[in-house]
Every structure is written in structure tokens, then in C-alpha cells.
Amino acid sequence: MELQLAIDLLNKEDAAELANKVKDYVDIVEIGTPIIYNEGLPAVKHMADNISNVKVLADMKIMDAADYEVSQAIKFGADVITILGVAEDASIKAAIEEAHKNNKQLLVDMIAVQDLEKRAKELDEMGADYIAVHTGYDLQAEGQSPLESLRTVKSVIKNSKVAVAGGIKPDTIKEIVAESPDLVIVGGGIANADDPVEAAKQCRAAIEGK
């Protein structure tokens, strides 16, 4: 089981500084969509240039022109790139092909997908590296959690890894870990903690069953 830190609300310098503080406890560091909107792909490059021994994910949330956008993210140092599960099949296939051609990985974000079971099966057959169930900020505010979605997707896929995101914190991560996802994505639960290093350490301990 892997742990990913999602960083959404910092500038690229502070993001790299935070990532380096917790890198002993995480496998993947994400440059979140808001940072990419604010600072562009150079934010991904800054992270890639300033951290070692962890993968860098660019949360592009691609919808179209997929092979080009994947190639650009890779050029700027991304190891994992995200595309939306609601994108066209042709876009997702092109994104997977471009990522794999460069020995990189593609994560498909299932945010706003209505028929999770059907879409997860299709994405699994297409060769997505990760399929991520994601309760976004707006639904978290309504009290929703990704647990049920995680169970649904995990029950139908054969080859892809299952990732889970959405309001996960050190004090709630154990119920997520109990469902055995392949990748647990924690954002504010680490980034906004009073002590991010301690929060990351607790999350790592949870996924290692300690």
C-alpha cells in the first residue's frame, strides 16, 4: 500500500519544502490542480528537481488533447499524471499510451462518474495504472466519504490499482486502510496539520498496520 501527499494550496517553493519534510513517509507527492492553475507546469518541475526517492504526480485532471497534455507533464518531470474518468475513451486510451511509452503512469480520477462499477471495469480493461475514487471538496462539505465508492471499485477491477482520496486524515485513515486500497491519498490531513511530519508519520504507520 502506498501513501500520497496531495498539496493544493501552497506555492511551488513551499510545496517542495513541505514535501521534503515528509518524504521519508510518503511514496508519491502530488502537485495539485490549484497549484498547476496558479503556477503552471514549472511547479511540477520545481518539485521534481528538488526531491528524490519519491514519485511526483501532476494532478492535471485532463479532459481532452490527452496525449499532448500527458507528454507536457512528463517533460516537466511528472511520474504520474491524472485524467478524468468522465473523459472520452479515446482520450483515456491516448493518455495511457503516451504515459506507458515514457515508462510513466496514469491515474484516472473517478470524480463525477455516475456508474462507478461500469466505468471502473472499462478503465481496467483499457490499462489504467490507478483508478482513484475521489470525494471532492464540494461533496466533503456535505459530509460524504469515499468508503462506499472504494468498495464498489475494488470489487470489480482485475489489473489496475485502486486509489482513494477525499478528506482522509490521520484519525480516519484506519477505516480506509481496512478496505485494502493500493494507494491512499491524503491532502489537508497532512498539509494543514499543526505538525505535518507527525501527521505523515501516523498515516504511514496506519498503512503499515502499526
UniProtKB/Swiss-Prot annotation:
Signal peptide: none annotated. Pathway: One-carbon metabolism; formaldehyde assimilation via RuMP pathway; D-fructose 6-phosphate from D-ribulose 5-phosphate and formaldehyde: step 1/2. Disulfide bonds: none annotated. One of its GO terms (molecular function) is hexulose-6-phosphate synthase activity. Keywords: Carbohydrate metabolism, Lyase, One-carbon metabolism. GO terms for biological process: 'de novo' pyrimidine nucleobase biosynthetic process; formaldehyde assimilation via ribulose monophosphate cycle; L-ascorbic acid catabolic process; one-carbon metabolic process. InterPro entries: 3-hexulose-6-phosphate_synth (IPR017553), Aldolase_TIM (IPR013785), HPS/KGPDC (IPR041710), OMPdeCOase_dom (IPR001754), RibuloseP-bd_barrel (IPR011060). SUPFAM superfamilies: Ribulose-phoshate binding barrel. It catalyses: D-ribulose 5-phosphate + formaldehyde = D-arabino-hex-3-ulose 6-phosphate. Its EC number is 4.1.2.43. Pfam families: OMPdecase (PF00215). PANTHER family: 3-KETO-L-GULONATE-6-PHOSPHATE DECARBOXYLASE SGBH-RELATED. Belongs to the HPS/KGPDC family. HPS subfamily. This is 3-hexulose-6-phosphate synthase. It comes from Staphylococcus aureus (strain MSSA476).
